[in-house]
Amino acid sequence: MLRIAVPNKGMLSEPAWNMLAEAGYRLRINPRQLVVQDPDNGIELFYLRPLDIAVYVGRGAIDVGITGQDLLKNSGTAALEHMPLGFGASTFRFAAPNESPITTLEDVQGKRVATTFDKLVHDYLVEHGIQAETIHLDGAVESSVQLGVADLIADVVSTGTTLRNAGLRVFAEPLMHSEACLIRSPRLNEQDPRLAVLTRRLQGVLTAHQYVLMDYDIPISKVAAAVAVTPGFESPTISPLHDKQWNAVRVMVPKAKVNQLMDDLYEVGARGIIVTALQASRM
């Protein structure tokens, strides 16, 4: 069976669980369960600490896992990113107290930086020629400055609310942009059929989240103009209607552009424009 690691807690956990459920995999019922076997789909799910997933995958104890790109980079393991998963977007930033004179990357020189991601931060500072002390903390790094342990912090920022509440402000360019991703062990062949099935299923969920099915009627004389607005993946489905002057068109379109596309189609001459959500797909 394919061994898959998922976060047991944290901001990536629920979206990861939901994505696997939408892909047809069985999840745990009891929150105390650490391992779930799904023989019908040929997988075992392991619920692990987010910080540890890349380590297990990198050492080959687990075949694939869902984690953050920042966690993968910080792990320093041999685990390989296989595909982005479209959720958990964040940036990794430096932050200093509002009243601090630290406002640029150069100001970090000689300072103390508290972070949970010490390898990521150390490597970034070395790359930019900055010498600073990196202080490892397992969480709640925002308190380190107030307690006098550090001069600034480096941490994951989603909305920035936690930093603002702690009297901190971000500065300098992000160390990196991150999102959830599927990672694989270097021992697992990229062409492994089990991985191929998982990849197709997850990509199908992503497509269903990002696209909708659009149906509309269009005069035959305006079909070319309408297809230019909604070309679809390969080509839209065009069918004749009872009225021989009209065709029906069915096409997948990006969910984020639905209203603009409906307006554009209406201007072209389309009528009866209907949008339907997708539950799953294989492209």
From Swiss-Prot:
Keywords: Amino-acid biosynthesis, ATP-binding, Cytoplasm, Glycosyltransferase, Histidine biosynthesis, Magnesium, Metal-binding, Nucleotide-binding, Transferase. Catalyzes the condensation of ATP and 5-phosphoribose 1-diphosphate to form N'-(5'-phosphoribosyl)-ATP (PR-ATP). Has a crucial role in the pathway because the rate of histidine biosynthesis seems to be controlled primarily by regulation of HisG enzymatic activity. Its cofactor is Mg(2+). It comes from Bifidobacterium longum subsp. infantis (strain ATCC 15697 / DSM 20088 / JCM 1222 / NCTC 11817 / S12). InterPro entries: ATP-PRT_HisG_long, ATP_PRibTrfase_cat, ATP_PRibTrfase_CS, ATP_PRibTrfase_HisG, HisG_C, N-reg_PII-like_a/b, N-reg_PII/ATP_PRibTrfase_C. Feedback inhibited by histidine. Its EC number is 2.4.2.17. It is found in: Cytoplasm. Belongs to the ATP phosphoribosyltransferase family. Long subfamily. It catalyses: 1-(5-phospho-beta-D-ribosyl)-ATP + diphosphate = 5-phospho-alpha-D-ribose 1-diphosphate + ATP. GO terms for molecular function: ATP binding; ATP phosphoribosyltransferase activity; magnesium ion binding. GO terms for biological process: L-histidine biosynthetic process. SUPFAM superfamilies: GlnB-like, Periplasmic binding protein-like II. Its main location: cytoplasm. This is ATP phosphoribosyltransferase.
